[in-house]
């Protein structure tokens, strides 16, 4: 393994080239095995699991307060999603048109949002405020609660339409949280209503780098573990939490299979000890569950969280808890492909979407 000398916060970044062998997905496809293309979130657990992982990762973490704030937000998201009101959904004609064009049926940038999402946003703030005792975030919550419908819709447009300059970065995670509830509810309700129909509401789309349900960018990819022990890579949607299959060792931005590398963080002390001893005998068992998959062709990257190394990984939580990796990979000249709506920073990517 080649050791990269970039270091930050008592961690060094290691660089591993991708294996030239066929990925398990490619082997399965060649053998005729059907891999589910789409994994939809579970209403009862999607935000609850995120909250649990955020609390787990917050322990002794430099970003403890922010991770715990995001955990409180996920708690309220979970509560409200269980009894979300009815909202307008695409009819059969609209679904057929989207399928015929190989487009997402609930596009984030163009969907006419139901006013119920604004009610959900205000209910979320009302429930969240008492959970933020003595937190600086209380001021942001109170300020957002004073937004008019027009102001709130404008901020939502800025957020969903590629991070326009007028976006309020302090309030964006809270607005995003309400939009996540709304889009997750729409996806699940539409699947429940029409999932057994001959023409399923969601399928493959032309742009495989974006969510087939809402056309949003991924937050990260996740190497899932199935019942037979297989490991399959899925991209995790930043907005609706749907996951769609993409074979491993393939760039999630340009789709190249050349020049793919995996970069990860190791404590400096352990890194030096392994180097002097020629590698730890337990190195494989101690491999980090979060890596950055980088592409030499387009100079983009996306994190991957690996369930085979830590069954508790959750893409949004583990992405937030590994920002040091983002900093080091960015310093190496790579640009992030995906987005985490809980923490927006930097300028919009040329492809669209705030980083």
Q: Which functions belong to the PLM regions below?
A:
Residues 1-6, 277, 281:
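A subset of signal/propeptide-processing and intrinsically disordered low-complexity segments
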Residues 2-94, 304-355:
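Long, contiguous alpha-helical scaffold regions
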Residues 11, 123, 127-130, 135, ...:
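A short, highly charged, low-complexity intrinsically disordered segment
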Residues 189-274, 278-328:
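Cys/His-clustered metal-coordination modules, chiefly Zn-binding fingers
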Residues 14-16, 24-37, 51, 139-153, ...:
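Short N-terminal signal/transit or membrane-insertion segments
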Residues 7, 12, 158, 213-214, ...:
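Generic recognition of cysteine residues
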Residues 37-198:
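N-terminal alpha-helical interaction blocks
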């Amino acid at each position: 393994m080649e050791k990269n000398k970039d270091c930050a916060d008592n961690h060094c970044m290691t660089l591993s080239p991708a294996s030239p062998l066929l990925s398990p997905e490619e082997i399965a496809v060649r053998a005729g095995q059907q891999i589910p293309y789409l994994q939809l979130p579970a209403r009862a657990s999607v935000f609850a699991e995120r909250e649990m992982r955020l609390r787990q990762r917050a322990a002794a973490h430099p970003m403890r307060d922010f991770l715990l704030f995001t955990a409180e937000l996920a708690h309220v998201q979970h509560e409200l999603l269980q009894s979300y009101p009815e909202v307008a959904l695409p009819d059969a004609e609209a679904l057929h048109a989207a399928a015929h064009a190989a487009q997402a049926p609930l596009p984030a940038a163009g969907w006419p949002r139901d006013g119920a999402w604004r009610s959900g946003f205000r209910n979320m703030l009302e429930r969240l405020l008492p959970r933020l005792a003595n937190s600086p975030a209380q001021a942001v919550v109170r300020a957002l609660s004073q937004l008019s419908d027009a102001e709130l819709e404008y901020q939502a447009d800025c957020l969903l339409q590629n991070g326009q300059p007028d976006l309020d970065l302090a309030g964006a995670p809270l607005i995003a949280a309400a939009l996540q509830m709304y889009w997750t509810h729409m996806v699940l309700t539409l699947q429940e209503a029409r999932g057994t129909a001959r023409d399923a509401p969601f399928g493959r789309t032309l742009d495989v780098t974006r969510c087939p349900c809402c056309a949003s960018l991924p937050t990260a990819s996740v190497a899932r573990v199935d019942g037979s022990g297989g490991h399959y890579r899925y991209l995790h949607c930043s907005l609706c939490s749907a996951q769609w299959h993409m074979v491993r060792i393939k760039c999630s931005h340009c789709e190249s299979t050349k020049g793919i590398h995996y970069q990860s963080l190791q404590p400096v002390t352990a890194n030096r000890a392994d180097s002097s001893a020629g590698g730890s005998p337990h190195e494989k068992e101690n491999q980090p569950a979060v890596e950055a998959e980088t592409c030499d062709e387009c100079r983009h990257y996306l994190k991957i969280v690996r369930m085979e190394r830590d069954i508790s990984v959750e893409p949004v939580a583990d992405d937030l808890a590994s920002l040091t990796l983002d900093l080091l990979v960015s310093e190496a000249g790579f640009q992030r492909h995906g987005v985490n709506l809980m923490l927006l920073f930097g300028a919009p990517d040329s492809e669209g979407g705030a980083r």
